Amino acid sequence: MKCGVFMEVYTQELPLRTSRRVELIDITSMVSGVLESSGIRNGILNVFSRHSTSAIFINENESRLLSDIESMLEGTVPVDASYGHNAIDNNADSHLRAVLLGGSQTVPVINGSMDLGTWQSIFFAELDGPRNRRIRVSVAGKP
């Protein structure tokens, strides 16, 4: 794909209300809606969590796998370990889990669609809920 000098950039914030302390939410359709609204056909799309106790990741939307991911997070970063940050607001595990998963993902946009693999979905990981959250989706490219 050739891309000229001029690109369009479209940004939209998505509100999200979570209901559990740890919750993995498939946001693929929400993000796809932003892409459609952008009118951009070829370029890149970035999904960014505006919070330090949440994350964005890409993986398969299969219930047992999602349960395994939650178990992996608990095993790797237990809630009840002795963390220095807990002296401030008792959620260090949430911050550390967010570091492991990452705060954003970028996906190629080709012919108006996200170029995700067959089994890939975009997830918002709530790691310190329930809360009201905001996700920033930015699309850059050519219409």
Curated annotation (Swiss-Prot):
InterPro entries per the UniProt record, alphabetical: UPF0047_YjbQ-like, YjbQ-like_sf
A Pfam family matched in the record: UPF0047
Domain of life, per lineage: Archaea
Family: Belongs to the UPF0047 family.
Name under which the protein is recorded: UPF0047 protein MTH_771
Species this chain originates from: Methanothermobacter thermautotrophicus (strain ATCC 29096 / DSM 1053 / JCM 10044 / NBRC 100330 / Delta H) (Methanobacterium thermoautotrophicum)
Lineage, highest ranks first: Archaea, Methanobacteriati, Methanobacteriota, Methanomada group, Methanobacteria
